[in-house]
Amino acid sequence: MDTQAFKRSLHHSDRYNRRGFESPTKRAQALEKAYQSNLIGSIRDNGYLFEHGRLRVKLAEAFGFCWGVERAVAMAYETRRHYPKESIWITNEIIHNPSVNDHLRNMNVRFISAEKGIKNFSSVQEGDVVILPAFGATVQEMKLLHERGCHIIDTTCPWVSKVWHTVEKHKKHEFTSIIHGKVKHEETLATSSFAGTYLVVLDLEEAQYVANYILGKGDREEFLKRFSKASSQGFDPDRDLQRLGVANQTTMLKSETEEIGRLFEKTMLRKYGPAELTEHFLAFNTICDATEERQDAMFSLVDEPLDLLVVIGGFNSSNTTHLQEIAISRGIRSFHIDTPERIGDQENTITHKPLGDDLITEKNFLPEGNISVGITSGASTPDRVVEHVIHKLINLSEEKAFVD
């Protein structure tokens, strides 16, 4: 499919909207009323520091809702106001935050059901309104909805759209797109649908495996088996790894994406020499500013003298998971929670998700004596949720009893 031609056609349709329905001022006011926090605002004004009794809280200097998330959430809410009686669907979670998605359900916005990763659009009818989430949607989904006569409200983050343009550029010039991302993540699924030939690598280890193969140090059958679900149809590593362009899922760890880019540039330089490098490797810049800012702020936060660190965000949120990885890399006790309710009301307990593991409940997670707690949150977490977490910590810090 000529994805660029399809997008041009879609964007000119009177059933497609990517600008929303309300003025930026009204949109900001509605979002502020729903999610902003006076407490968090005052903590920002106080150098991101809050102290109460024996509790000292240090916030990361960049956290929470990014511009792309704010835009997507606001557009989703105003869509219901604009279409008060119509059937409204959304192709996936608007963002990876349970409270925001629950609010949409309460507004009678229905989520497209999926079984084993396959979405069922059979209930969506002509004239229905369908919201595309901040992560975007695959070009095949857009085409299906457009041909069915749906009204499409596109809240895709512009940074994600930028990555789509990058992989389309790769396709136009017959380069294979190496996509640094999680193969089942909604954003990576959407990005790969706009690519031509592509290969998804999860991390530096997988990228090194691919680089070794390029340099003649791999087994073809093993390669094909390893990337059978992470490559374009008919992918041939002997044919398709000769001309490479790099792109990424915008929420991946910035430093790792940059390292992967350098690895493939050096690999192609080694194989083809400096005179032919530009014929075999395309430089890239698809790292999201907001992701970069939050990760940089996290690196600064972990340099603080902290007893523990709380990372707030959806358990399926890629950008939140990478913030947790930074804390772990520094050996700091850290707890990834998705809602304030994971912290006990009176008992000194926290139910959290260790990296790559299931939920566990830890007793006596707040130590005795003075406590220094670092807090950050993913790009899909409202300030009001962070405020509720701080109130939970205040209450527990005032409690005397520890759990046996």
Swiss-Prot record:
InterPro entries: LytB/IspH. Keywords: 4Fe-4S, Iron, Iron-sulfur, Isoprene biosynthesis, Metal-binding, Oxidoreductase. Binds 1 [4Fe-4S] cluster per subunit. Pathway: Isoprenoid biosynthesis; dimethylallyl diphosphate biosynthesis; dimethylallyl diphosphate from (2E)-4-hydroxy-3-methylbutenyl diphosphate: step 1/1; Isoprenoid biosynthesis; isopentenyl diphosphate biosynthesis via DXP pathway; isopentenyl diphosphate from 1-deoxy-D-xylulose 5-phosphate: step 6/6. It catalyses: isopentenyl diphosphate + 2 oxidized [2Fe-2S]-[ferredoxin] + H2O = (2E)-4-hydroxy-3-methylbut-2-enyl diphosphate + 2 reduced [2Fe-2S]-[ferredoxin] + 2 H(+); dimethylallyl diphosphate + 2 oxidized [2Fe-2S]-[ferredoxin] + H2O = (2E)-4-hydroxy-3-methylbut-2-enyl diphosphate + 2 reduced [2Fe-2S]-[ferredoxin] + 2 H(+). Its EC number is 1.17.7.4. PANTHER family: 4-HYDROXY-3-METHYLBUT-2-ENYL DIPHOSPHATE REDUCTASE, CHLOROPLASTIC (PTHR31619:SF5). Catalyzes the conversion of 1-hydroxy-2-methyl-2-(E)-butenyl 4-diphosphate (HMBPP) into a mixture of isopentenyl diphosphate (IPP) and dimethylallyl diphosphate (DMAPP). Acts in the terminal step of the DOXP/MEP pathway for isoprenoid precursor biosynthesis. CDD domains: lytB_ispH. GO terms for biological process: dimethylallyl diphosphate biosynthetic process; isopentenyl diphosphate biosynthetic process, methylerythritol 4-phosphate pathway; terpenoid biosynthetic process. (2E)-4-hydroxy-3-methylbut-2-enyl diphosphate binds at H96, H185, T250, S317, S318, N319, S380. This is 4-hydroxy-3-methylbut-2-enyl diphosphate reductase. Dimethylallyl diphosphate binds at H96, H185, S317, S318, N319, S380. Isopentenyl diphosphate binds at H96, H185, S317, S318, N319, S380. It comes from Prochlorococcus marinus (strain MIT 9211). It is an enzyme of class 1 (oxidoreductase).
